[in-house]
Design a protein with these regions (language model features):
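An anionic, glycine-rich sequence signature occurring as long contiguous blocks
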Residues: 64-88, 92, 146-151, 155-257, ...
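Long, low-complexity C-terminal extensions of enzymes
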Residues: 315-366
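Active-site-proximal, Lys/Arg-enriched surface segment
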Residues: 1-80, 195, 206-207, 211-212
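Short, surface-exposed basic-aromatic patches at helix termini and helix-loop junctions that form
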Residues: 14, 115, 134-144
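Short, basic/hydrophobic alpha-helical segments
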Residues: 1-7, 94-121
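Electropositive nucleic-acid engagement tracts
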Residues: 1-36, 109, 140, 165-190, ...
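Short amphipathic alpha-helical "interface-anchor" segments enriched in bulky aromatics
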Residues: 19, 23, 185, 245-276
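Basic, amphipathic alpha-helical segments enriched in Lys/Arg and hydrophobic/aromatic residues
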Residues: 271-333
Length: 366
């Protein structure tokens, strides 16, 4: 799937991928790998927990020339709690791994493919994955990580540079001796800059300050960016010290595209609704949902808006709204049915009334 995207889409020299996890609800004690997990979207009922699977998912974040940022899911790994392992039959040959390890395996899978294509890889993660077990394995394969820092992250300044002719005993230090307080840096009035950033489909000014620091989980120097919003401030970082603040801000904003993926895979394709119990079968059907989602997006990439969706029959809708994934799927369904109808008409001519009736039915169905 990744090779198909690399060959088909007009991607630049830098590939941006997003990693995050999402739950799918399942029911029944015989569903292997399912357990009680934290619910990230409790909703009006305030349902703090749910029973089901947790999927650590890797998506390719791209920017469509007309429709903006979107993500193409590529691969996922199923997270099973350690206490749940006893319920899985031993002959399934399933081993325990944390979310951080699963995310690192996804990076180790995609990194050689991207490198072989002659491109660089940036990985965007949320704060839950900014930990040493993930960062160390990821940096080992030559990948740049963009993420969000904790506001109390244990940052230090850069190690002191030696003066000319000065020598130091032992190995050169990686980390500085002085701690850096993000809260104090954010509260200081000086050092702020303004830049135009394209985030969430809009180009807006962002107030930020940036500096270099050392961070032990990242194994050395990182680029830190503090962004000031209306009522709060947020710290981000890049393991590439040469990355600009605009690149970091825009890359992290594109992380939101995977959330739309999770919504579409569940609501449009019905991920989690397949009635299977075997843990490997669950893994297979989830990937089918991911890949059919990506193939539909790939099919509609170069098609104009009018071919994908027609909002004339919905005057209450916003005509400028970009086509949703459901619109793209309906457009593909419509094309398949029209092709089938034209094939039948070529074999045996059909009455005009039958063709008109079939066209009306397709309009209602799609």
């Amino acid at each position: 799937m990744l090779l198909l995207l690399l060959r088909t889409l007009p991607l630049g020299d830098r590939i941006l991928a997003v990693i995050d996890d999402t739950p799918t609800k399942r029911y029944g004690p015989q569903v292997e790998g399912a357990d009680i997990h934290h619910n990230p979207t409790p909703g009006p009922a305030d349902q703090k927990y749910l029973y089901g699977h947790i999927w650590v998912t890797l998506s390719l974040a791209v920017r469509h020339p007309c429709f903006g940022a979107l993500a193409l899911p590529l691969r996922a790994m199923l997270y099973v709690r350690r206490k749940t392992m006893a319920k899985i039959p031993k002959w399934r040959d399933w081993t325990f791994a944390t979310k951080l390890v699963l995310a690192a395996r996804l990076v180790e899978w995609i990194a050689p493919i991207v490198k072989q294509a002659g491109k660089t890889l940036w990985i965007v993660v949320d704060g839950g994955y900014v930990k040493a077990p993930f960062l160390k394995r990821t940096l080992r394969v030559g990948v740049t990580v963009i993420g969000r820092l904790r506001k109390d992250a244990a940052l230090r300044d850069l190690p002191r540079k030696l003066r000319r002719g000065e020598r130091r005993r032992g190995r050169p230090p990686k980390y500085g001796k002085h701690k850096i307080s993000l809260a104090k840096r954010a509260a200081h009035r000086e050092g702020w800059e303004v830049a135009q950033c394209t985030v969430y489909g809009q180009t807006v000014p962002k107030l930020y300050k940036t500096f270099l620091a050392t961070y032990r989980p990242a194994g050395g120097v990182i680029r830190v960016v503090i962004v000031e919003e209306d009522h709060d401030w947020y710290p981000f970082f890049s393991t590439d010290p040469n990355a600009t603040a605009v690149e970091i801000i825009e890359s992290f904003a594109d992380r939101a595209t995977i959330e739309q993926d999770f919504h579409d895979v569940k609501e449009v394709w019905g991920a989690g609704q397949q009635q299977v119990r075997n843990i490997w079968t669950n893994l297979a059907v989830y990937h089918l949902n991911l890949w059919i989602h990506t193939l539909v997006e790939l099919w509609s990439w170069s098609r104009p808006r009018g071919e994908i969706c027609d909002r004339r029959q919905s005057p209450w809708d916003d005509t400028d709204r970009r086509p949703s994934h459901a619109d793209r799927r309906k457009a593909l369904q419509r094309q398949i049915m029209e092709h089938e109808l034209s094939t039948l008409a070529a074999v045996q001519p059909l009455p005009r009334k039958i063709l008109q009736l079939a066209q009306r039915l397709m309009d209602l169905a799609c």
